[in-house]
Swiss-Prot record:
Protein name: Pre-mRNA-splicing factor 38B
Basic and acidic residues bias locations: 243-255, 291-327, 345-421, 451-468, 480-495, 511-546
Sequence similarity: Belongs to the PRP38 family.
Keywords assigned: Acetylation, Coiled coil, mRNA processing, mRNA splicing, Nucleus, Phosphoprotein, Spliceosome
InterPro entries assigned to the protein according to its UniProt record, in alphabetical order: PRP38
Function field: May be required for pre-mRNA splicing.
One GO term describing the cellular component: precatalytic spliceosome
Organism ancestry: Eukaryota, Metazoa, Chordata, Craniata, Vertebrata
Subcellular location, record wording: Nucleus
Residues modified as Phosphoserine: S5, S288, S290, S318, S320, S448, S473, S475, S481, S527, S529, S534
Length: 546
């Protein structure tokens, strides 16, 4: 954002000359201060930025803490102009460290864990860096930056101006900006909480030669540019302070200027109307008299502030004493109360323990009774199950007996039926066999009769023939005797074969007929005996005939 003040806008040569004249006049009136480098009109009033145009080349941790800070989001958001931001710096800034005191716990940590390069855990970002980023959001012009670094009211305004240059300007231009201020002897305390006082010149030499600034880093300077800066700093050693009256006078002047520039001006956060704003056109019309008047007013105001601070200190001391007594009394009361409470707690604990023991005993009794009841119920259930099993067994046995009896009855009935059937079959078979045996015996008698008749007839015929043939030769008788012997040999073999066939038939019949009576056997034997007798008779008859 551009500055809204009409006095600081414009790029004409007369305005530059007027600003330079006003700066020289203020330096003459206020004592030895910083010398302003010449600003040529050819450079223009627009100040280009170097590096990242959104982050101002700040450490990401610091930038995120700035953007999330309520101070930056609420209070600094209301400041719209360059002069309002300068007044805020005058009243609020007391150091130029990036973090407030005690907000970052880095004790005992080293390296990257210690947050030396800004990568550790964040803390409360300082007011100075919030205002520095607010200046960056305003997009300052060259004239406004020169007004910051040559400001006479507060060294912290100048320090933030130099820091703005270090973060936003090219490394090749840093020497041109800082060269005329390297011997500036104005003091300021740069550390949060105090304890690190240095001059503006020492701070600028640190900006040019070191990258680290407390727990953050400046933008890196290229190696050739850094070597050039180091050589030029060697040619510009630090000046020794003057001795004698001139040194004393200069020290007195610096003391007066430090008092007038001290940031702890007033308890109110608003800007004092008596304080000069900056080296601008407001001081062109006034002279040394107006500046002296402002100095007198400032001294008076500082004296009143000191008195008010001393009163406040006295009040604080008295309050601290009263608070100490009150604390002691309250501590004694608290001790008494704590003792009584501890006693009450002990009594309550005892009562609670007793009640717990009683409850536990009751619970144990309940558990015992419950276990007993459950045991009795289990025994009853077991007895019931045993009785049921016995009943089931008895029922099963009865059913098995009935089933067996039924089976036996059925088998007996079946056996009776089978026996009756077998008897019927045996009777029918015996009848058939008897009938067959009778028919066979009849046939055998008939055959035997016919055979006997035939034999008798043959015997008669043979006897006749024998008688007729006896007269024949004895040779024929021999042949006949041989033939008869052969016949006799053949006849028993035939009988044996017949017997074998009959025995086979009998065995076959026995296999097929399992239940035959003895009557059948007797019949067979009789028939066989009859047949044998008939055969024997035939053989005898043959022998007799022979």
């Amino acid at each position: 954002m551009a500055n809204n003040s009409p006095a600081l806008t414009g790029n004409s040569q007369p305005q530059h000359q007027a600003a330079a004249a006003a700066a020289q006049q203020q330096q003459q009136c206020g004592g030895g201060g910083a010398t302003k480098p010449a600003v040529s009109g050819k450079q223009g009033n627009v100040l280009p930025l170097w590096g990242n145009e959104k982050t101002m080349n700040l450490n990401p941790m610091i930038l995120t803490n700035i953007l999330s800070s309520p101070y930056f989001k609420v209070q600094l958001y209301e400041l719209k102009t360059y002069h309002e931001v300068v007044d805020e710096i005058y009243f609020k800034v007391t150091h130029v460290e990036p973090w407030e005191k005690g907000s970052r716990k880095t004790a005992g940590q080293t390296g990257m864990c210690g947050g030396v390069r800004g990568v550790g855990t964040g803390g409360i970002v300082s007011t100075a860096f919030c205002l520095l980023y607010k200046l960056f959001t305003l997009k300052l012009t060259r004239k406004q930056v020169m007004g910051l670094i040559t400001h006479t009211d507060s060294p912290y305004i100048r320090a933030l101006g130099f820091m703005y240059i270090r973060y936003t300007q090219p490394p090749t231009d840093l020497w041109d900006w800082f060269e005329s201020f390297l011997d500036d002897e104005e003091d300021l305390d740069v550390k949060a909480g105090g304890g690190c006082v240095m001059t503006i010149g020492e701070m600028l030499r640190s900006f040019l030669t070191k990258l680290e600034w407390f727990s953050t880093l400046f933008p890196r300077i290229p190696v050739p540019v850094q070597k050039n800066i180091d050589q030029q700093i060697k040619t510009r050693p630090r000046k020794i302070k003057k001795d004698g009256k001139e040194g004393a006078e200069e020290i007195d002047r610096h003391v007066e200027r430090r008092r007038s520039r001290s940031p702890r001006r007033s308890l109110s956060p608003r800007r004092s109307p008596r304080r000069s704003r900056s080296r601008s056109h407001h001081r062109e019309g006034h002279g040394s008299s107006s500046f002296d008047r402002e100095l007198e007013r400032e001294k008076e105001r500082q004296r009143l502030e000191r008195e008010a601070k001393e009163r406040e200190k006295e009040r604080r001391r008295s309050r601290s004493i009263d608070r100490g007594l009150e604390r002691r009394r309250s501590r004694s009361r608290e001790r008494h109360r704590s003792r009584s409470r501890s006693r009450d707690r002990k009594g309550d604990r005892r009562d609670r323990d007793r009640e717990r023991e009683k409850e536990n005993e009751r619970g144990r009794r309940r558990d015992r009774d419950y276990d007993k009841e459950r045991g009795n119920e289990r025994e009853k259930e077991r007895e019931r199950s045993r009785e049921r099993s016995k009943e089931q067994r008895s029922r099963g046995e009865v059913e098995e007996k009935k089933h067996k009896e039924d089976k036996d009855d059925r088998r007996h009935r079946d056996d009776k039926r089978d026996s009756k059937k077998e008897k019927k079959h045996s009777r029918s078979r015996s009848r058939e066999r008897k009938h067959r045996s009778r028919s066979r015996s009849r046939n055998a008698g008939k055959r035997s009769r016919s055979r006997s008749k035939e034999k008798s007839s043959k015997h008669k015929n043979e006897s006749k023939e024998k008688s007729n043939k006896r007269s024949r030769s004895g040779s024929q008788g021999r042949t006949d005797s041989v033939e008869k012997s052969k016949k006799r040999e053949h006849s028993p073999s035939k009988e044996k074969s017949r017997k074998r066939s009959r025995s086979k038939e009998r065995s076959h019949k026995r296999d097929h007929s399992d239940s035959k009576d003895q009557s059948d056997k007797h019949d067979r034997r009789r028939s066989q005996s009859i047949e044998q007798e008939s055969q024997e008779k035939q053989h005898k008859n043959k022998d007799e005939t022979v």
